């Protein structure tokens, strides 16, 4: 039976989001202390413009926000990993990096063998979204659970990639680490560029809307137009 794993995709400016969230929480706290005194509703969202101005007069030192900022998480990608015995090493590597139960990286002991927090550092619009560099985060590193690189499994090289396919990124033959990519395109000519060169080991089961959001974050040069990272991951 095929194993199923997930990646929660986050997008945006985390620092700016934290600042907006802090402003909203401060507004909630301020309102809870003053609602009864001034006869105000219990939640910031219920305040009229006049009531908002009243609360601003109570606290002139802080910027108040009356609605929570939009969530950074844009959704979940759920993948079915291949059940082929000929891909067992590749699927075991990916699943373990999703759960993060293998401890620290051998070549970067301060980093975990875990996709959590990993950047999707390369997103080529209408082609691929790549991430999983657990050691450096920028595409120049990566490490498998086997301690470095591991060889291509031939069964995966025989699978023709399609939109939603999950494959190992590499820097040449037999150079798989933790880096992976998800196929964004349906175009045959672009798919042909991937065929036989990368080990395909999974397919998207759920989250096609999230795949579209990833594509929207992509540019022709591969640099995402907004920060994108894995904010949650594991087995389903």
Show which residues each predicted segment covers.
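Cross-family detector of peptidyl-prolyl cis-trans isomerase
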Residues: 1-236
């Amino acid at each position: 039976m095929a194993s199923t794993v997930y990646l929660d995709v986050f997008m945006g400016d985390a620092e700016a989001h934290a600042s907006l969230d802090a402003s909203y929480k401060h507004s909630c706290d301020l309102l809870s202390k003053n609602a009864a005194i001034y006869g105000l509703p219990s939640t910031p969202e219920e305040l009229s413009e006049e009531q908002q101005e009243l609360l601003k007069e109570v606290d002139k030192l802080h910027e108040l926000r009356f609605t929570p900022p939009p969530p950074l998480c844009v959704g979940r990608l759920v993948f079915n990993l291949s059940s082929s015995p000929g891909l067992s090493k590749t699927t075991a590597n990916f699943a373990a990096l999703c759960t993060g139960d293998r401890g620290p990286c051998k070549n970067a002991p301060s980093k975990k063998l875990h996709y959590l927090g990993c950047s999707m550092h390369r997103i080529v619009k209408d082609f691929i979204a790549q991430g999983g560099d657990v050691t450096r985060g920028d595409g120049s590193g990566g490490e498998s659970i086997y301690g470095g690189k591991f060889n291509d499994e031939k069964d995966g090289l025989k699978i023709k990639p399609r939109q939603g396919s999950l494959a190992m990124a590499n820097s040449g033959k037999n150079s798989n680490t933790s880096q992976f990519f998800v196929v964004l395109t349906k175009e045959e000519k672009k798919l042909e560029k991937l065929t036989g060169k990368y080990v395909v080991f999974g397919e998207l089961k759920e989250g096609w809307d999230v795949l579209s959001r990833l594509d929207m974050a992509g540019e022709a040069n591969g640099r995402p137009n907004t920060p994108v990272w894995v904010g949650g991951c594991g087995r389903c």
